[in-house]
Amino acid sequence: MAETKNWYNTREAIEKTSPSRLDGINLKEETFQRWSYTSFLQELGQRLNNPQKTIATAIVLCQRFFTRQSLTKNDPKTVAIICMFIAGKVEGSPRPAGDVVFVSYRVLFNKEPLRDVFERLKMTVLTGEKLVLSTLECDLEIEHPYKLVMDWVKRSVKTEDGRRLCQAAFNFVNDSLRTSLCLQFGPSQIASAAIYIGLSMCKMTLPCDGDKAWWREFDVTKRQLWEICDQMLDLYVQDFVVPRHGL
């Protein structure tokens, strides 16, 4: 089943009218929290040996949750753990709740949880899953830019350059998950920007097909392409550092 809800909004609406902003959290704090819980999810997914697609799904689910729920009322790390648990089931790489909770605690605190702490957190995840699913209206199947990037590179770039470009573009897609781009643009539009920046980083150029630029295949306008590229690159000049994880 394809995505059925319209989860996309403008950057202005996301930054000014999110539930967290309406509850008094300023933009810098909300951006910081997004960095923090997405970074946590990336590390958690890697520790669980989850595929990158599962990690990306967890991050998008978590970001979508906070378009409808406030950071003031929901602990972002707990929601993130729940989203990783759900994403594993959605993407065919399920892990028992206990495994997800145990590894999460190790990532957050760099030690094993006491038995009672473990059981409380596990119960919180299992009961909190209902709130997350309800908030997301069980709309859980997400298309990511990775396959779009890979298919286009295979068609358009010779093998030795293609591998280099594909990896560069994947890196930009992964990093973009720390921004709100997945709430603003579809996977094909994000894929086009990741390829565009990847081409520049790899010092590669592609000819236009007459008057049609290659990126028009991705249903993206030039203005959208520049906007996505700008936001991707802005990511690398943020004026804060994500701290050590912790609940």
UniProtKB/Swiss-Prot annotation:
GO MF annotation: an example: cyclin-dependent protein serine/threonine kinase regulator activity
The keyword Cell cycle is annotated on this UniProt entry: yes
Any Gene Ontology biological process: regulation of transcription by RNA polymerase II
Keywords tagged on the record: Cell cycle, Cell division, Cyclin
Pfam families for this protein: Cyclin_N (PF00134)
InterPro entries named in the record: Cyclin-like_dom, Cyclin-like_sf, Cyclin/Ssn8, Cyclin_N
Protein origin, superkingdom: Eukaryota
SMART domains, per database record: CYCLIN
Family: Belongs to the cyclin family. Cyclin T subfamily.
Protein name: Putative cyclin-T1-1
Species the sequence originates in: Arabidopsis thaliana
